[in-house]
Amino acid sequence: MADVTLDFQFTSSIEQVWKALTDSDMLAKWIWNNDFKPAVGEKFQFRSEPNEWWDGIVNGEVLKVEEPHILSYTWASAGETTMITWTLKTGADAATHLHFEQTGFSEETKATKGAIEGAKYSWTNFGEQLKKVLEQ
């Protein structure tokens, strides 16, 4: 079972949402600067401003690419490696439905008050930024 699950809905086409999830320049508009390439085995890095608790770096490796429906990669940051999976579907309403899962948090992290909630909060904010980017 996923530790964090979120569902988003966009009026943009599935191809537009896929591009926002896989194009480095688009990702930089709603997550952080990066060198992401959507190919299995590709290693990448997201870079944000560091703070007193975090170095601002997320390392990852692409695990699965099934354009335009499934994208999965590792998300390694602050000593923890989890797996991110995005699943895209076009609904009967012609909207693009985007399902997000983050799995693999350590038992220590799960036991830390607010850690999973913090991850959910961050990804919810990223989803709101993604919506703004898609509406431009």
For each predicted feature, which ranges?
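Hydrophobic ligand-binding cavity/cleft-lining segments
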Residues: M1-D35
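A generic structural signal for beta-strand entry/edge sites
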Residues: D3, K43, P68-I70, D93-H97
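Generic structural detector for well-ordered beta-strands
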Residues: D7-T11, Q45-R47, E61, T87
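Hydrophobic pocket/interface hotspot
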Residues: V17, L27, F44-F46, V62, ...
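Tryptophan-centric aromatic hotspots in well-structured domains and transmembrane helices
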Residues: W18-L21, W30, W75, W86, ...
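A solvent-exposed, acidic/Ser-Thr-rich amphipathic alpha-helical stretch
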Residues: N33-F44, W53-W54
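Hydrophobic-ligand binding "helix-grip"
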Residues: E52-D93, T103-S106, K132
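A conserved amphipathic terminal alpha-helix motif
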Residues: T103-Q136
